[in-house]
Every structure is written in C-alpha cells, then in structure tokens.
C-alpha cells in the first residue's frame, strides 16, 4: 500500500487543515504533471470519519496513477481546533473549493474527480452548485443524502435555539455505535478505540448540514456530471431505495448504481472479497478528467 504524505492546507480564513496527499504519477512540476498524471481525485470523508478510514482506497487510486487529495474536514480527524464546528454551509463549500484549487495546482489537472463518502457525499454533490468548479465526475459512496437515522424532534428544537443563542453548543452525532458502520471484527475494534473519530458536532454545523440538503432536491435542475453510486445492502444509516430513486430520476449524462450484497455502511471496511475498491478505481479510470 502506498503511504500518503501528510500536509497542511491553509484556508482563506486562516484555518489550517490536515490532509493526506498521494501524488500518483503526478509531480510538483505542473508541466510534467499534465503529461503524466492520469487524473486528480478529491476524496471527502463522512461526518464522524477522517482520512485514515479511507487510506486503502486512496492508496489504490494513487497506485493506478491518480493524484489524490484527502483532507480532514475542519474540526475533524487530525484537526484539533474547533472540534465539530463549522460556521456555515458557505464556509464548508469554500473549504472544498479551496481543496480543489490546491489539488489542481499540485497535479496540473484541469478537472477533478470527486469521491464523497457518507456525509461527504452531501458535500461532494453541493460542489455542483458552483458552476465554476471543475468537477469531472462524482462517486457517491453510501452518501448521506437520505438518512434513516436523524436527531429526535425535541433535540432539533434545541439545535435551532442553540444555533441562534450558542452556535458552538455540542450535540451528539446520532450514529455513534460502531456496528452501524461495519460487521468486520477488525474494524469494529478499530472504531471503538479510534481517538480521532468525531462524536459531537456544534449546532452551527448541524444547521450548515441541513442547508446543504437543499441541493439534493434541486440537483435535477443541474446539467450534472457522470455519477456512480455505491451502496451497501445492509446499510443502517442511509435509505438505499430513496437514494436509488433520486439518482434514477436525474437527467444526467451517465449514471451507474452498484450495490454490494451483505455489505455494511462503510464499504472500505468490508472483508476481502468485496470488490468496492476495485470498482471505484475502475470507474474513475473510465471517466474523462476534463470538467
């Protein structure tokens, strides 16, 4: 497995975010990168997770020749400052746009393939709202567009009040049981002892997340990009059927749906025999890298 380089990405508001970087066949010389890089991949993790969960697929993409940037979202993973907090949906989108700019600068590629896992699928989809962003394709991995699990109604009222009075007040993420992510013993043990796993987010973050949901309903009005949807049969976090119906209704140029039998939410954690990582690398490899 190809180990990533650990880097810091400085955002326009001064926040420094940790990230994993695999140059693939790209180099730091932009001209050489254009000649050699197979493409560029921005990899977005979920609400609780961080880049370490997805190093296997990041490494495999790099071994296939892609330059891969896998940031830890502000307030999550290796980022200790402002744990669980985001000021607004606009700030989250600005961060992602800045990641894309950095990836294009490092790789020399014009377009960017975006992979969004779980909650990261919501952020990935919202990048299409910004018509100027060079999204070449979209891989949605068990995306959190239609969750089964939600905050209780009474808790939502407290979130709404806190968003006005105390936006940094923390609330539990309602998917804290490791068994919701995987049934693989090795990874269950990992999740139980993962010190970087995010278990709470602020009222401000929850409000920002809710605002990102709006584009899911409006996505059919966007010309779209090639998209692949990867689902787990036994997902306890997202509604697979609603997600499938949503994708099939999109008038986008290319849509693919793959569901893995007996699999659980975090496909990365499935035991040997699951072809998810191979399928992800293969599908991205068939997409044009120009947006």
Can you annotate each of these PLM segments?
Residues 117-202:
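Alpha/beta-hydrolase-fold enzymes
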Residues 38, 46-49:
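Active-site glycine-rich loops that stabilize anionic/oxyanionic intermediates
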Residues 225, 239-248:
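Short alpha-helix in the alpha/beta-hydrolase fold that links the catalytic acid
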Residues 1-33:
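N-terminal cap/lid segment of alpha/beta-hydrolase-fold proteins
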Residues 256-291:
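Catalytic active-site module of serine/aspartate enzymes centered on a nucleophile-bearing elbow/loop
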Residues 58-81:
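Conserved alpha/beta-hydrolase
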């Amino acid at each position: 497995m190809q180990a990533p380089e650990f880097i810091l990405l400085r955002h326009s508001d001064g926040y420094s975010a940790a990230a994993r970087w695999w140059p693939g066949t790209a180099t730091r010389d932009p001209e050489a990168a254009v000649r050699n890089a197979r493409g560029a991949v921005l990899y977005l993790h979920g609400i609780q997770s961080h880049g370490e969960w997805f190093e296997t697929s990041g490494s495999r993409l790099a071994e296939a020749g892609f330059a891969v940037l896998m940031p830890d979202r502000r307030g999550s993973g290796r980022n200790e400052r402002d744990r669980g907090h985001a000021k607004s949906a606009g700030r989250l989108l600005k961060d992602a746009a800045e990641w894309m700019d950095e990836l294009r600068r490092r790789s020399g590629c014009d377009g960017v393939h975006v992979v969004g896992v779980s909650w990261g699928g919501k952020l990935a989809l919202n990048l299409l709202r910004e018509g100027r962003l060079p999204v070449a394709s979209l891989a949605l991995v068990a995306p959190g567009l239609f969750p089964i699990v939600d905050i209780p109604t009474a808790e939502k009222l407290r979130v709404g009040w806190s968003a006005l009075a105390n936006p940094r007040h923390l609330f539990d993420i309602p998917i804290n049981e490791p068994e919701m992510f995987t049934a693989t013993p090795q990874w269950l043990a990992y999740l139980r002892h993962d010190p970087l796993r995010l278990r709470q987010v602020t009222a401000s973050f929850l409000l920002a997340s809710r605002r990102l949901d709006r584009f899911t309903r409006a996505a059919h009005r966007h010309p779209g990009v090639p998209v692949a949807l990867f689902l787990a049969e036994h997902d306890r976090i997202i509604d697979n059927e609603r997600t499938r119906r949503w994708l099939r209704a999109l008038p986008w140029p290319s849509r693919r749906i793959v569901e893995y039998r007996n699999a659980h939410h975090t496909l990365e954690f499935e035991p040997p025999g699951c072809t998810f990582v191979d399928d992800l690398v293969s599908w991205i490899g068939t997409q044009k890298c120009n947006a």
